[in-house]
Amino acid sequence: MRQAGATGALAFGAPGLAVGEGLQNQPDALNTPKTESQAAEKYAHPPGVFINRPLTQVSRMAEALLDDMAGRNSDFFFNEASPRSGLVRDRAPVVGRSLSRVSSIAATGFGLSALCIAAKYNYLRPLDCEQRVEKTLAFLLEECPHEHGFLYHFIDIDSGQRLFGSELSSIDTALLLCGVLLCRQYFTGNTRIEALATTFYRRINWQWMMNGGTTLSMGWLPDQGFLKNRWDIYSELTTMYLLAIGSPTHPVPPEAWDAVQRPVVSYGGIDYISGAAPLFIHQYPHAWCDYRNLRDRHANYFTNSIAATRAHQLWCLVQGQKFPWIDQDMWGISASDSRQGYRVWGGPPSIGPLDGTLVPCAAAGSLVFLPAECSHVLLTMRERFGDRLYGRYGFADAFQPKVGWYGDDVIGIDVGIGMLMAENLRSGFVWECFMKNREIAHAMREVAFHPDPDANTQVL
């Protein structure tokens, strides 16, 4: 479906830097550290240095790869969506036709965002993207089942009906809403898209999802009511809370922002705020919302995610003692497929059991934090494993090179986080467009975001 004239295959023979060239002070692959402290000493930059790298510092080969990825990712979000509803499949096979009827509302949020990128760069015909967005928003608002504006986590791709007994999900509805609001700002000449997007946002009753507490519930089930767990510990929740606080119709109090616990953890001499969850929790908040050079009463969340990514890199290098293919050239583990099915794994702290599987979206979703390192990882994966790992929709979800296992599928949210972060690395387009939403600006004022005088992250 890629439009004729859009960027085609990777030009790996084109003039540019070889893999690894341009990366400063690359460590010796044969001298991998055995402990956390050794890893910190060998790989960690001095305090503050690793947050001073411009996002433009990637090789021309990396730029070509990211451009090619974006085109392939665009194909996923267009081809693997229902022509009737616009809902996006949760996953699709690397090779062959998908017959799955399972849609993820989070993947649909990433998909709406992908259509903006695809239209901007002509990866797809802009009119096709605009029409698909309009159809999707109309379906979400007029046909898709909901309660108080919240949608079920997994739904039928054509009817929108609930699947698997899944919950009304607050976080997944928020990820969907991010895509909706990005489309509102990008397709500004389409008054119907603007009206549908605004009405969709206004319908969501965030106050109801508080369920009488000080923080948002994780969800609701028709037969059981609200889930016991709440969004009360730091994770991917930050942009969701901004959407809730900035709601034009059902805002939650700004105090909900401060009610979230922000535990500080330390790894390899790096201190950062984190919950005990995989790397994606430090990626998703930054896909749409631009936190650079800003802080609230607690932290600068962009530099916090840089620190978390650096700690993850160090942790991966320690895992290389058990899995020697994990080194400074190839690292990154987040929730993904595995030979035994879907796994929520990663670290630090270690969440497993680990089996040496690597996850491309761990690096792709961290491109804005460690641009040179993460783009180098993606180039290495593509060059070493070629078509076994990199296909029509980009990278397979995960792979284990020792046993020669390459995932059969791509997963929508993993494709999406890599695509959006790559675009923010390349141009800042998603950030710039999304931050035009007045509700986000209002929410950031409400929770006291202000310029960080100590920030060293002016990157674009």
Regions flagged by a language model, labelled:
Residues 3-4, 25-27, 39, 46:
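Positively charged, low-complexity intrinsically disordered regions
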Residues 9, 34-37:
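Serine/threonine-rich, low-complexity intrinsically disordered segments
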Residues 17-34:
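Signal peptide processing junction and immediate N-terminal pro/mature segment
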Residues 1-20:
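N-terminal export signals
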Residues 11, 23, 29, 42-43, ...:
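Generic N-terminal simple sequence motifs
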Residues 39-460:
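Ser/Thr/Asn(+Pro)-rich, low-complexity disordered segments
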